[in-house]
């Protein structure tokens, strides 16, 4: 069939479909057939035009397809027509740095760059720090992409370390090599002593063979002893020669020995008294009346030659101490009228229960039954400071609390609420302390200069730390030969550079410099913890009970008797630089928990603590988080965002850092716990002006732990005290503190090593 026939058939089909192909029967067929043919011809013309247009479009599409390639559409060659190519790899199709390829099925993104994971179009950073690529105790910092490790910790050396990708992080760990300080000379052991290298640090041991002494006094050839100025030492071979402020020399027995310095004998319990009597007349030459239990006051109530600390019947009344309701007062009848813990013979309120036996004014009548607790001759019911003597009863803010005991004397706050135990009421506590010395700016006599002691010798309102004329005598401190004592004439008869007005007693406090623990502060003369603040660090709940503190030896010995919640006994004296030493002894074999001491105390959320655990143990209260204590000595900086409570309690128990609570500054690498009924002597040096901290522990004459230099400035000074946590029968004996702002020689070498 030819093209014309096909077109005719197609036209007839269309006519039938439209009803135009029907020819009625009968009638005149010629005119009608002519008319039908004309209509058919017109329809064919329409079909022909339609087909011509379709052929043209098909030709155009054919040409377009033929000129298509993999890189996009080429311009059409049909005259008068053009096509703009559409790119498949448009900007942003793939992640930056990822190769985009166009395929027959569309754009395809390559793999994500190293350090990222994803499908190429969407890539996320990989945290390589999860692979622990850094050396232990070195912080890993994740970047995008990659990671880098901070510098090797003190005591180690190594190159910087960084990389990209998990594969690299897993197979390439940071390498830090231990520095042998004993070989490099970076140690601070005294000459002629043994230096023992440890991982990341070192320890100073005893004197080498042929030498005698220790790390405090130095090691000298046997038979040769010298004072720090090079002169021959007059001291016993177990004593240190000390140069006093006035240039004189004194002798102090070394740790583990006791006596007058010219003669020294073994001191097993480190309480300052020799095991056997020495041939000297001083008190410290007497035989210790408790050889194995520290009792620096040598108390002996029944005078039987056995000290109360180790006498099973201290008062000699035939009733053992454990059963005696007056263990230090004879009372064989054990009469107890008010049925409290104390027998009538020693009860300061016989007819009223008062287990604490508190007696504020020391008049022999307990506070519980004393109608004038503070002894200011104003009865308690009318006294606006019933526990603080204030004869004038002044009350500036009219809140019913006298100025003498008001923690916000200029602001009405009758409830006296003080949640952080810093003696500043919450109503006026701003917590703004720009110099970090523990005194808020509005109460700081040197708000921009750290001076925790707040010493103000001339009482002019400006602290000595920022006053260029401390004694207000008109002579600037830089030229004043008695900086703390007014002497405008600057008399100095012996021309030794020290004015006559302060010769031998620099602060004019009537205590000679040789025995004055703070010769440049008239407010502090002797070590004394008889007045102290108790701070309970877990005040809520019933996990345990609060500590029970007993002070002996005129404030130089503290005993804690109960298995208690964490607690502090804090002295009221604040220090700038200080040396703090004491003997620590657990006088029981029934427990294995924490005991220690604190320094830099500013409030119940801010202080340093040195704490010693005997055995590893998980704290029995798992809320708010699991806390695990490891054995050994730990130095921690407490900066708690919550203050006393469960969070701080568990953070103190836990060995390690706890976010927003506690930072572990140092831990004894030996992981050795304290021994039952064994005495240890500690020595602390704290110089808050530069952040210098160093603590050492001795067992007998042997140095057993040394933190070496630790630098931290979280607390720029503060108060001292002792610490316990769930441990009973702790003795802190022979306590001594001394103001000292002199920077130790090992500070600079350690600082340079860190840099």
Curated annotation (Swiss-Prot):
* Source superkingdom: Eukaryota
Give the region (Disordered) as residue ranges.
296-341, 353-501
Residues modified as Phosphoserine: 394
Q: Where is this protein found?
A: Secreted, Extracellular space, Extracellular matrix
Question: Which residue intervals define the domain TSP C-terminal in the entry?
Answer: 530-744
UniProt tissue specificity: Expressed in cartilage, including nasal, knee epiphyseal and rib tissues. Abundantly expressed in chondrocyte and tendon extracellular matrix (at protein level).
Q: Which GO terms describe its cellular component?
A: extracellular matrix; extracellular region; extracellular space; protein-containing complex
The annotated regions of Basic and acidic residues compositional bias extend over 332-341, 353-368, 412-424, 456-465
Q: Which InterPro entries match?
A: ConA-like_dom_sf, EGF-like_Ca-bd_dom, EGF-like_dom, EGF_Ca-bd_CS, Growth_fac_rcpt_cys_sf, NOTCH1_EGF-like, Thrombospondin_3-like_rpt, Thrombospondin_3_rpt
Q: Post-translational modification, briefly?
A: Proteolytically cleaved by metalloproteases ADAMTS4 and ADAMTS1 with ADAMTS4 showing more potent activity.
The molecular function terms in GO held by this entry are:
BMP binding; calcium ion binding; collagen binding; heparan sulfate proteoglycan binding; heparin binding; integrin binding; protease binding; proteoglycan binding
SUPFAM superfamilies in the record: Assembly domain of cartilage oligomeric matrix protein, Concanavalin A-like lectins/glucanases, Growth factor receptor domain, TSP type-3 repeat
Q: Name one Pfam family in it.
A: TSP_C
User: Which residue numbers delimit the EGF-like domain?
Assistant: 85-124, 125-177, 178-220, 223-265
Disulfide bond residue pairs: 89-100, 94-109, 112-123, 129-140, 134-149, 152-176, 182-195, 189-204, 207-219, 227-241, 235-251, 253-264, 280-285, 290-310, 326-346, 349-369, 385-405, 408-428, 446-466, 482-502, 518-739
Glycan-bearing residues: 119, 740
Q: Domain comment, in the record's words?
A: The cell attachment motif mediates the attachment to chondrocytes. It mediates the induction of both the IAP family of survival proteins and the antiapoptotic response.
What this protein is called in its record is Cartilage oligomeric matrix protein
The protein's organism comes out as Mus musculus
Q: Which gene encodes it?
A: Comp
């Amino acid at each position: 069939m030819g093209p014309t026939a096909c077109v005719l058939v197609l036209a007839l089909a269309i006519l039938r479909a439209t009803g135009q192909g029907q020819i009625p029967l009968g009638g005149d067929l010629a005119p009608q057939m002519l008319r039908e043919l004309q209509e058919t011809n017109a329809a064919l013309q329409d079909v022909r035009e339609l087909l011509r247009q379709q052929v043209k479009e098909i030709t155009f599409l054919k040409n377009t397809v033929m000129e298509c390639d993999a890189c996009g559409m080429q311009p059409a060659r049909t005259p008068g027509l053009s096509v703009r190519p559409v790119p498949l790899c448009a900007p942003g199709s793939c992640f930056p740095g990822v190769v985009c390829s166009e395929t027959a099925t569309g754009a395809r993104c390559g793999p994500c760059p190293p350090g990222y994971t994803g499908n190429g179009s969407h890539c996320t950073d990989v945290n390589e720090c999860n692979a622990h690529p850094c050396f232990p105790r070195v912080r890993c910092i994740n970047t995008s992409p990659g990671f880098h490790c901070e510098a090797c910790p003190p005591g180690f050396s190594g190159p910087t370390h960084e990389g990209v990708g998990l594969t690299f992080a897993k197979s390439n760990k940071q390498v830090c090599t231990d520095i042998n300080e004993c070989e490099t000379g970076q140690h601070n052991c005294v000459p002629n002593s043994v230096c023992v290298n440890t991982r990341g640090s070192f320890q100073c041991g005893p004197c080498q063979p042929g030498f005698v002494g220790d790390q405090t006094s130095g090691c000298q050839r046997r038979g040769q002893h010298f004072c720090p100025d090079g002169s021959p030492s007059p001291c016993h071979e177990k004593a240190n020669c000390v140069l006093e402020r006035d240039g004189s020399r004194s002798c102090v027995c070394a740790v583990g020995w006791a006596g007058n310095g010219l003669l020294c004998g073994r001191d097993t319990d480190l309480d300052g008294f020799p095991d056997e009597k020495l041939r000297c007349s001083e008190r410290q030459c007497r035989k210790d009346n408790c050889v194995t239990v520290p009792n620096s006051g040598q108390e002996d109530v029944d005078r039987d030659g056995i000290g109360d600390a180790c006498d099973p019947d201290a008062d000699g009344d035939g009733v053992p101490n454990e059963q005696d309701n007056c263990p230090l007062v004879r009372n064989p009848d054990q009469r107890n009228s008010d049925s409290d813990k104390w027998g009538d013979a020693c009860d300061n309120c016989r007819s009223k229960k008062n287990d604490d036996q508190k007696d504020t004014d020391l008049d022999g009548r307990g506070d519980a039954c004393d109608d004038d607790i503070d002894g200011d001759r104003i009865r308690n019911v009318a006294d606006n400071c019933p526990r603080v003597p204030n004869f004038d009863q002044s009350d500036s803010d009219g809140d019913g609390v006298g100025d003498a005991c008001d923690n916000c004397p200029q602001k009405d706050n009758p409830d006296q609420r003080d949640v952080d135990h810093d003696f500043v009421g919450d109503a006026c506590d701003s917590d703004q302390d720009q110099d970090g010395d523990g005194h808020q700016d509005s109460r700081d006599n040197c708000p921009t200069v750290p001076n925790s002691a707040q010493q103000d010798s001339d009482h002019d309102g400006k602290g000595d730390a920022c006053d260029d004329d401390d004694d207000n005598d008109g002579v600037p401190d830089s030229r004043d030969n008695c900086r703390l004592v007014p002497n405008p004439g600057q008399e100095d008869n012996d021309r030794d550079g020290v004015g006559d007005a302060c010769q031998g007693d620099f602060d004019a406090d009537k205590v000679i410099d040789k025995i004055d623990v703070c010769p440049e502060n008239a407010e502090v003369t002797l070590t004394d913890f008889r007045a102290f603040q108790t701070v309970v660090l877990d005040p809520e709940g019933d996990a345990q009970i609060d500590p029970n503190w007993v002070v002996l030896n005129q404030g130089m010995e503290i005993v804690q008797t109960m298995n208690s919640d964490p607690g502090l006994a804090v002295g009221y004296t604040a220090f700038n630089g200080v040396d703090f030493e004491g003997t620590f002894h657990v006088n029981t074999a029934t427990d294995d928990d924490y005991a220690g001491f604190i320094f830099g105390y500013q409030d119940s959320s801010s202080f340093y603590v040195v704490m010693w655990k005997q055995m590893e143990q998980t704290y029995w209260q798992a809320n708010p988080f699991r806390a695990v204590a490891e054995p050994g000595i730990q130095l921690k900086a407490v900066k708690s965002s919550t203050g006393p409570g469960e969070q701080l309690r568990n953070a103190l128990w836990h060995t390690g850092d706890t976010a927003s609570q506690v930072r572990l500054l140092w831990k004894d690498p030996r992981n050795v716990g304290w021994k039952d009924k064994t005495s240890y002597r500690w020595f602390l040096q704290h110089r808050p002006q530069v952040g210098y901290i160093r603590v050492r522990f001795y067992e007998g004459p042997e140095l057993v732990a040394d933190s070496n230099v630790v630098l931290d400035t979280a607390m720029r000074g503060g108060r001292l005290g002792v610490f316990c946590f769930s441990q009973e029968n702790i003795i802190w004996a022979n306590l001594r503190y001394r103001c000292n702002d002199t920077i130790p020689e090992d500070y600079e070498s350690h600082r340079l090593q860190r840099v």
